[in-house]
Amino acid sequence: MLPYMDQVLRAFYQSTHWSTQNSYEDITATSRTLLDFRIPSAIHLQISNKSTPNTFNSLDFSTRSRINGSLSYLYSDAQQLEKFMRNSTDIPLQDATETYRQLQPNLNFSVSSANTLSSDNTTVDNDKKLLHDSKFVKKSLYYGRMYYPSSDLEAMIIKRLSPQTQFMLKGVSSFKESLNVLTCYFQRDSHRNLQEWIFSTSDLLCGYRVLHNFLTTPSKFNTSLYNNSSLSLGAEFWLGLVSLSPGCSTTLRYYTHSTNTGRPLTLTLSWNPLFGHISSTYSAKTGTNSTFCAKYDFNLYSIESNLSFGCEFWQKKHHLLETNKNNNDKLEPISDELVDINPNSRATKLLHENVPDLNSAVNDIPSTLDIPVHKQKLLNDLTYAFSSSLRKIDEERSTIEKFDNKINSSIFTSVWKLSTSLRDKTLKLLWEGKWRGFLISAGTELVFTRGFQESLSDDEKNDNAISISATDTENGNIPVFPAKFGIQFQYST
């Protein structure tokens, strides 16, 4: 389940018209969400509230071998945050959990081509207005969190410098480990490219990220299928100035919709040349209540590979649809007595007297469009050829919009998430839903590998719900055991 402060951060981006889908950090967010979702490792309780329209608080408790907790505070001067924030009772489940990310390629436009976009998309209009607005107001966000009993601290500051630029500062401080790390981000988003310059005090790490969108300009036809597809290529480069250790990777992402069903799908291909790691993912919405993802990893140096699968199954609320259907069945037809359809009535005669004869009006129009026969035949052939293509494109767009509207109008009550890996031989199960105003997440991670307990670190062993002895593992008495189990409750007002 998405933490409360992450919901506030997402609302801040929405209110300031900052798109996170162009970030290279989130280029593989869909596959990570479906495969690497987090399993609670203990009993966790989070209570949050909005004290003022600009301040938010959150209190966390967890029982992981001992009672731990944290206190968070967030302040933002962005206006209309309440339009994007909802409490745990009113928020839709698909907005409160991490799930398949549907991209909006229409948002990827440059300033020069912004005038060519359709005015039907209100989000595009808002972004276009923001780009050309000379009265841009700088907005800020301040976040702090303190953990206890460890007294660790973390903080974040976000400053919108202009409609296209943003500055971010993150810091972590640990008194126990004598660790103090400060990371600075400067981001520039031109909607065709998003560039990030990063500097961290840890090892004096310097980084650069860039993401370029290829399919950004709509075609001449506003109903073109290209408005629902996008191709993005990104890369990142790192260098530690102290240890002189480099790092780099590149990723290609393609997002589109099925022309027959309108269901979205995302494909990514990542490559790390230094470590020889290649990763490819395929994610698709197989239905309004189901999602599937597959990932294949391969290393060129060690010749090792891995295949992972993930899926989601959503449960809808059906009684509202049945109620509307019953109400529609009770509607009675309009009685003929309410409409005067007598041709001899005075109202009908007055209507015929005032309405002109359209046939005579058409005949009175002079014939100024006399076209030769061969040109008329060529025009008819072109009209027939293009009309069939445009009709097909319009049908595809209608199918895509119907599928998206069906998902947005659905009311989901719970979701099951499953993920497995053939090399690690693990199975993760997670259930998320709503109950009496609470957002609940409960899950477990099942392990099928012997000797798994010995491969864990001391912290991971303490996080396990059940401790398995080495004797039982070697004898095969417990071939399958839960390596992690927990439940999380969230409540916000």
Curated annotation (Swiss-Prot):
Compartments, record wording: Mitochondrion outer membrane
Single GO BP term: mitochondrion organization
Coiled-coil region list: none
Superkingdom of the source species: Eukaryota
Other facts noted in the record for this chain: Present with 768 molecules/cell in log phase SD medium.
Binding partners and assembly: Component of the ER-mitochondria encounter structure (ERMES) or MDM complex, composed of MMM1, MDM10, MDM12 and MDM34. Associates with the mitochondrial outer membrane sorting assembly machinery SAM(core) complex, which consists of SAM35, SAM37 and SAM50, to form a SAM(holo) complex.
Function: Component of the ERMES/MDM complex, which serves as a molecular tether to connect the endoplasmic reticulum and mitochondria. Components of this complex are involved in the control of mitochondrial shape and protein biogenesis and may function in phospholipid exchange. MDM10 is involved in the late assembly steps of the general translocase of the mitochondrial outer membrane (TOM complex). Functions in the TOM40-specific route of the assembly of outer membrane beta-barrel proteins, including the association of TOM40 with the receptor TOM22 and small TOM proteins.
The protein's name: Mitochondrial distribution and morphology protein 10
Protein source organism: Saccharomyces cerevisiae (strain ATCC 204508 / S288c)
